[in-house]
Amino acid sequence: MAASPGPAGVGGAGAVYGSGSSGFALDSGLEIKTRSVEQTLLPLVSQITTLINHKDNTKKSDKTLQAIQRVGQAVNLAVGRFVKVGEAIANENWDLKEEINIACIEAKQAGETIAALTDITNLNHLESDGQITIFTDKTGVIKAARLLLSSVTKVLLLADRVVIKQIITSRNKVLATMERLEKVNSFQEFVQIFSQFGNEMVEFAHLSGDRQNDLKDEKKKAKMAAARAVLEKCTMMLLTASKTCLRHPNCESAHKNKEGVFDRMKVALDKVIEIVTDCKPNGETDISSISIFTGIKEFKMNIEALRENLYFQSKENLSVTLEVILERMEDFTDSAYTSHEHRERILELSTQARMELQQLISVWIQAQSKKTKSIAEELELSILKISHSLNELKKELHSTATQLAADLLKYHADHVVLKALKLTGVEGNLEALAEYACKLSEQKEQLVETCRLLRHISGTEPLEITCIHAEETFQVTGQQIISAAETLTLHPSSKIAKENLDVFCEAWESQISDMSTLLREINDVFEGRRGEKYGYLSLPKPMKNNANLKSLKPDKPDSEEQAKIAKLGLKLGLLTSDADCEIEKWEDQENEIVQYGRNMSSMAYSLYLFTRGEGPLKTSQDLIHQLEVFAAEGLKLTSSVQAFSKQLKDDDKLMLLLEINKLIPLCHQLQTVTKTSLQNKVFLKVDKCITKTRSMMALLVQLLSLCYKLLKKLQMENNGWVSVTNKDTMDSKT
């Protein structure tokens, strides 16, 4: 049986659709980085899977052949519609026209070839039992399928370049207008240009926001979110800082304040473009060192690999890796804000880890020369000991950083220093300004260092990026508050200078609030709370439009409708428990299938809470938004399962693919229902959505169970093969 195709870019860097004897693989250079492209390909991949996953030289009933022909024709028709859209895009983008047209021609030819190869009108080999024996050119179908997927992917990626071009063009317009704003000398001219700037920023915010939501890479999404947050907050700062400069053109601190805002916005704009184009200017590389928790995680994986392979790596590499991790501990031990008790405990655990690594290396050397049971047990004990020490070290570091952050946030909750700076400003008290500016600088250094420590123990790359963003924000905003306060102190009666200081102080307070949220998220990750059930919730912000505000009011169905929703929700809640039980069976909790399954269960649980009037989902619009994300996560799960199926034998693979092909249509149906407008029938829409979700969760439970069994079977077969191979090797030596 040919390897089944899976969506490009799923579970790997390249867009590889399969391998094996069929050679059903796509150009590995076609890397897919966005969810929209991936999801556009999924229905096509599913149909092609149906076409090529059949045995060669088998008897097929007339009904089966007609079904195959219908799929072939459907693929061809879908490709035809797709090509028309591609050609329209080409006509609007002359710089990409030739490339898109070539890919469209290839796609059209491949679609026609598949339709021709699955056409049964010319088959007349009817057997006596009413069955038709077909000798379809399966190699031809696979070649055409490979060409089709490759060309369709090329068109989608070229169309994606159009989106990137739009974002770059929008950024360039914003930059050009910013340059005009920097040079403006009159209020009237400033107001006109800023109005244009505001419109351009709104356009850029929409384009970059859509791109952020479309990115597959969570690290890039977090970086994009950080850059967009800077732009959003700096837009108001730019307005007040520029007005202050125009009001007080000879004030040095006002100019310094304004320049700081412009510089930060330019850096953020460049960061967005860097992310969407996936390239750094002038060949720059990411110089930020990995966090302590990430280093410990990688180190533990290396020592645990010794259970399987004693020659996997060198002793020197392990020693160097541990020393690098312990060297980074200096961020904690050298910090003036780390308590004496925490410092002593960190140093003690670091010394213990060094000693246990030396013991492990000693046993490891013995294990390489002596293959005895006692040595193997001693090696296992050494691995467990150092793993335990590292876990204790992680706990101590986490306790140190989070306790410091919590104390700091509590201490600065009333913003005494900011209030004092505002007061000294309107009083024109330069002496008091110097005193409170010094206090704010101290507070800033504390917060910056705390963010640095939190990054080490954050636990995930997106949270690491959020910590870096918080650190940079405190660093920059602290200086800007001082320059804004200095301007007000020099011009105490200036309303615009006071307004400007207020804006920067609000930005500081907002970042303090964000840091509280960040601390909660870091604790949730560390403790593995069920609080992660809300991890994928991303609610839209209410608009000022009355219609939108109306739709965001909590929906109140009648008692009968509430009872029906509650009943559906109860079944959904039970299914999330079943899914969680299946997930707990897996030894490898980092497995992609497990991660997507856990995410779906998490979101389904928040839907269940919604049916009880609890949890974070407050309105039907919140619910619909969450369901859209749930459907997308389901499609990602099917992609990972398809990738796993390629490792299985034909019968097991077919059994798994049948389950996948049940889930994919449900995901698409749920996406369709969420987009369908049902005026004054909100309950009907919610009812349909929860019913679809329940069906998907039931399939998820089956899929998780089946994948777990097939994985265990695969591991046993592989272990058996290794044992036989080793025995044959020993026999040959004898």
From Swiss-Prot:
Compartments, as annotated in UniProt: Cytoplasm, Cytoskeleton; Cell membrane
Topology versus the membrane: Peripheral membrane protein
Protein name in the entry: Alpha-catulin
Biological process according to GO: cell adhesion; Rho protein signal transduction
Induction: Down-regulated in cancer pancreatic cells undergoing differentiation and apoptosis.
Main subcellular localisation: cytoplasm
Family, as annotated: Belongs to the vinculin/alpha-catenin family.
Phylogenetic placement of the source organism: Eukaryota, Metazoa, Chordata, Craniata, Vertebrata
In-chain residues carrying the UniProt-annotated modification Phosphoserine: 374, 538
Pfam families: Vinculin
UniProt-recorded Gene Ontology molecular function terms: actin filament binding; cadherin binding
Record flagged with keyword Cytoplasm: yes
Tissue: Widely expressed. Expressed at lower level in neural tissues and at the highest level in the adrenal gland.
Biological role: May modulate the Rho pathway signaling by providing a scaffold for the Lbc Rho guanine nucleotide exchange factor (ARHGEF1).
Gene3D superfamilies tied to this protein: Alpha-catenin/vinculin-like
Disulfide-bond pairs as recorded: none
Entries under InterPro entries matching the protein: Alpha-catenin/vinculin-like_sf, Alpha_catenin, CTNNAL1, Vinculin/catenin
GO cellular component, one term: plasma membrane
Coiled coil (residue ranges): none
Organism: Homo sapiens
Subunit structure: Interacts with ARHGEF1. Interacts with DTNA. The interaction is required for correct localization of both CTNL1 and DTNA.
